[in-house]
Amino acid sequence: MLSLHCEAQNCGWSRVDHLVSYDASGIWNPSVYRGLVAGLTVAQVGGAFWEGSETRFGKTMWQGIDSELIAGASAEVGKRIFTRARPNEGNNPCLWFQGGSHYSFPSGEASVAAGLVAPYMIEYGSDHPATYALLLLPLYVGAGRVKNQAHWQTDVLAGWAVGGLSGWASHRLDTPLMIQLLPHGVAVGIKKQF
């Protein structure tokens, strides 16, 4: 039985994925990093409505909203397709297509965190290299998800890729998707209406 268990974990992913000691204390408490991402999201939405989409910064904020929504939705679709077991659901990174409530791949929270910062890095990175420090947010969220034994390392890597690609796709649009969907007046920020 032991040889069967070891053989089952000898898939390609198992060379990257490994169980990390559980830690949900202090900064690794999920409510801490979820609160940080939620706070930044609220600030981004408020800033986007205030600024509008006619300025460089305003347009980037609207692209960030698009990117977060696309990243979250894409990750959710991936979870439903791959139904990978989480580390705390058997400690085997090779358990794919398990059905039921196994939604480990890709990490939705890592996707959203990467999607939140990607448009800003793409827009401002060449002008202001310090913008790349925003990568600390998805790095922090991803590390938290692994330390909470909620995701394997490759779940987080895939989540970062989904978020980054969502940011890239959102940044390529001349008019952000949310601006296309909302009434035309939203393009002009609240600050210009006063």
Regions found by a protein language model. Give the residues of each.
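Outer-membrane beta-barrel "beta-signal"
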Residues: 183-194
